[in-house]
């Protein structure tokens, strides 16, 4: 839920840290019904697609209860498991605010839910993307530590002027990451698990490249926010993310300053290519060719 730049102060009605009350009691039945529709169609298809850590998190937080979750309820279990809580925010928050929340084990989640006609695509993350997509993974201790470390690293990246590189790491792991498991590729990224169409595309479509995770490679790679990804990076396990947090990012930023960015569809020497994509979807015009990302 991060926006751009530094905070110039919260909007009216928000606290200094940009949080607001969730106002769970104000949701209408129609809004609860949207959650139920989204939840049921995602969980029906995610078995055998989402990683075990995500599926265990769904169960641990009892997110299958009917309707939009009450943050106060899920926070009791989440805090017990990993020390994290979910806090409501009015929308995208500035980068410095976002990093501060993560560094203190608070995940900022949008309070609103999409309209019924927006089930398959929404430009700004809503409560379904943020809570269904992100929060189950926060029940895993290793992933929870990674997210806190990311927040701490974000504050340093802002000071060094390397936010673009760090944002790519978040994008290609937390939002659109895949994992190699003994049972095959599995999804752990929130942008995929919360999207019916991208849950299929990311694993099954021949279009995108699927490349083994390499930290510096990921931090050099551009990304697109308007459609399916043209490349997915694949970790071997959640432990890979723990290893990332132990790296000297200062030295990495120095090296990245002297090399060029990598395009979204490029394969470069040294890549561990799992799937060399056809890029047919992007070449045909992406969503304009008939497929919708959600």
From Swiss-Prot:
S-S pairs: none
GO biological process assignments: L-phenylalanine catabolic process
Top-level division of the source organism's lineage: Bacteria
CC cofactor: Fe(2+)
Sequence positions that bind Fe cation: 129, 134, 175
Region (Disordered): 1-20
Keyword Metal-binding: yes
CDD domains in the cross-refs: pro_PheOH
EC primary class: oxidoreductase
Pfam families from the UniProt entry: Biopterin_H
Keywords of this entry: Iron, Metal-binding, Monooxygenase, Oxidoreductase, Phenylalanine catabolism
GO-annotated molecular function: iron ion binding; phenylalanine 4-monooxygenase activity
Record pathway: Amino-acid degradation; L-phenylalanine degradation; acetoacetate and fumarate from L-phenylalanine: step 1/6
Cofactor note: Binds 1 Fe(2+) ion.
Family: Belongs to the biopterin-dependent aromatic amino acid hydroxylase family.
Name the UniProt record assigns to this protein: Phenylalanine-4-hydroxylase
Organism per entry: Caulobacter vibrioides (strain ATCC 19089 / CIP 103742 / CB 15) (Caulobacter crescentus)
Taxonomy of the source species: Bacteria, Pseudomonadati, Pseudomonadota, Alphaproteobacteria, Caulobacterales
């Amino acid at each position: 839920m991060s926006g751009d730049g530094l905070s110039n102060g919260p909007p009216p009605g928000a606290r200094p840290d940009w949080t607001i009350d969730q106002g769970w009691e104000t949701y209408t039945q129609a809004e609860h019904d949207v959650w139920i529709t989204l939840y049921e169609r995602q969980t029906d298809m995610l078995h055998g697609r989402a990683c075990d850590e995500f599926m265990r998190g769904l169960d641990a937080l009892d997110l299958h209860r009917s309707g939009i979750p009450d943050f106060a309820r899920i926070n009791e279990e989440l805090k017990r498991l990993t020390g994290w809580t979910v806090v409501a925010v009015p929308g995208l928050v500035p980068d410095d605010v976002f990093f501060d929340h993560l560094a203190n084990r608070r995940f900022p989640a949008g309070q609103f839910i999409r309209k019924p006609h927006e089930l398959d695509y929404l430009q700004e993350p809503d409560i379904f993307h943020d809570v269904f997509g992100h929060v189950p993974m926060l029940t895993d201790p290793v992933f929870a530590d990674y997210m806190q470390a990311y927040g701490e690293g974000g504050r340093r990246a802002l000071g060094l002027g390397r936010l673009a590189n760090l944002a790519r790491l978040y994008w290609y792991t937390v939002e659109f990451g895949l994992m190699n498991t003994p049972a095959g590729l599995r999804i752990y990224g929130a942008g995929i698990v919360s999207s019916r169409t991208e849950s299929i595309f990311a694993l099954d479509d021949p279009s995108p490249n699927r490349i083994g995770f390499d930290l510096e490679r990921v931090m050099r790679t551009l990304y697109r926010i308007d459609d399916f990804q043209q490349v997915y990076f694949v970790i071997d396990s959640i432990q890979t993310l723990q290893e990332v947090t132990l790296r000297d990012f200062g030295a990495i930023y120095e090296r990245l300053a002297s090399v060029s960015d990598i395009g979204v569809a490029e394969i470069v020497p040294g890549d561990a290519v799992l799937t060399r994509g056809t890029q047919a979807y992007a070449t045909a015009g992406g969503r304009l060719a008939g497929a919708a990302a959600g």
